[in-house]
Amino acid sequence: MEDLNKFAQTIKKSYGTISYADRRKCSFKLKKLLQVADKDPNIQEKCDELALFTAEAYEKVQKRKDNLPKINYPEDLPVSKRHDEIVSAIMNNQVVIISGETGSGKTAQIPKMCLEAGCGIRGIIGHTQPRRLAARAVAERIASEMGEDLGKSVGYKVRFTDVTSPDSYIKLMTDGILLSETTHDRLLLDYDCIIIDEAHERSLNIDFLLGYLKTVLEKRPELKLIITSATIDPESFSRHFNNAPIIEVSGRTYPVEVVYMPPSMPEDEEDEDEEFAQDLPQMVLKAFKYLMHEHGPGDVLVFLPGEREIMDMMGFLGKANLKGVEILPLFARLASSLQHRIFTAHSGIRIILSTNVAETSLTVPGIRYVIDPGTARLLRYSPRTKVQSLPIEKISKASANQRKGRCGRIGPGVCVRLYSKEDFDLRADFTDPEILRSNLAAVILQMAALHLGNVESFPFIDPPQLKQITDGMRLLEELGAFEKTNGKNLNELKLTDIGHKLSNLPVDPRLGRMILQGAKLGALKEVLIIVSALAV
C-alpha cells in the first residue's frame, strides 16, 4: 500500500504539466484505482496503464509548446501599439476587459496576444463571436496572418461545421457553441483562456455566458477570461468581474461628417412608420446620389433591418440604372461564397446592403460612406400574448455611433442619417440587453440542466424581472419539462425526461417539444419542416 501511495503522489505531481482536460481524466482514474486497490488482482497492470496515460498527456503538452506557431502583428493597427500592456495584463490578471473602437484590430490580434502570454498550451484559446459569419471570417483572418491553412493552429466551429483539429491553439466559435459545450464540460476544461468578443451586444447567450463564467472562474483560478467590447459601457463588465482592469484602444479613424436627411412628415403622424418603410428605397437612392454628387465616388454601406428589406432594396436599386455600381448583400445566413465577395478587390463603386452584422462583428473594407435609416429588428417578448417577435425599432445612440464609425477608416467619411437630429437626440443611449426583453424559458431550462440553482440569485449583469422568470418556469411546466410543483425556486423543480431531451436541442423549447412529439407520433419529418420554417 505504501508503494501505491508513492505512485499516487507521483501521478498528482504531474497534474501541473498536463492539460486541464487530461488532469480531470487522470484524477478520476487515480481515484477509481485507489478505491479498488485492496481487491483488484490486476492493480499493477492498471497502475502501468495510468502511468502510460500520464506520460502521453505530458508529451502532448510538450508537443504543443514545441510547435507554437509564429506570431506577428500588423504594425499599423492601434491594438498592436498596446501589445506589451495587453500581454502583461493577461499574464497578471484572471479577467481583462479590452474596449476598442471599430477598426482597432482587437478581434484578430487579442487571441495571438493570449498565445504569447502563455495561453493555449494546457488548453485551447476559445474565442466566441455572436454570428457564424464573423466566427469563420475571423478564423480565416488569424490563420492567414499566421501564414497557415485554416483548421491547423486556428480553426472554427459553428453549427453543422467543425474546422478544428486536436493541434489547434485558437478556436473561433459562436457563443451558442460554447454554451452547448457546458452541458458535457461544465468547467470548460478544454480551455485555458476564453475570449468573449462583441460583449457590448448583450445578447441572451452573452449575458448567460458571462454569468456562468463568473461561477466557473471561482472554481478554476487558472482560467483566463478576456472580454472585448466596443466603447459601449465597458465599466459594467468590469464591475461584474470584481473591478477587472479595462484597457482602452482607439480605432484608426478619420473625421466623419454626419448629414441628417429626414423624410418629409406625413399629414397623419400615426402613418409615419408605414410611410417611412414605403419611402425607404427612394430615400436610400436619394442619399446615394447626394453622396456621389457632393462628395465624390466611394463605396457605400447601407444598414437595413433584415434580409427581406435587403432583397427588396437590391431589386429597387438594380432597376435604378446605376452605371458602374455593384450592389452586394451582407447578412448572417448568406452563403459563404457570396460573403467572400465583400472582401475581394474591385473596380468602380460598391453598395453593400447589410443587416447590423456589419455594425461591429465584421469590418467591410474600403467603406467611405454610410447610409443609416436608424432602424433594426430587435427580439421582443410580450408577456401578455406569450409571443416573441422581431419588430423593426429605432436603434440607440450607441448603435447609431457604431454605424457612423464604419466609414472614416480609409479617409474622411460621411454618414447620412435618414432621420432628424432631434430624433437622434431623443433616442435611448444604449439598446436594452436582450435578457430584459426575451422569454427566459431556454435560459431557465439550461440552468436546470446544469444544476445552477436559483435563477434569481444567478450572477447576471442585469438580473431579469421576476415576472419574466415566472413566465419562463410556467411555460416549461406546460411543456412537461418540469415536474409539477408549488415551488417557484429552480432548486425545487426537477427536470423530467422530456426536460432533459429539450435541454439538448438547440431550438426554442416550444419548437423542441414539437420535435419530440413529432418523433413520438411518427411524423418527425413533417414536423421538422414546420419547425425549420418557424425557427427562421
Predicted regions and their residues:
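C-terminal helical accessory/scaffold domains
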Residues: L524-L534
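Short secondary-structure transition/capping segments
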Residues: P464, L534-V536
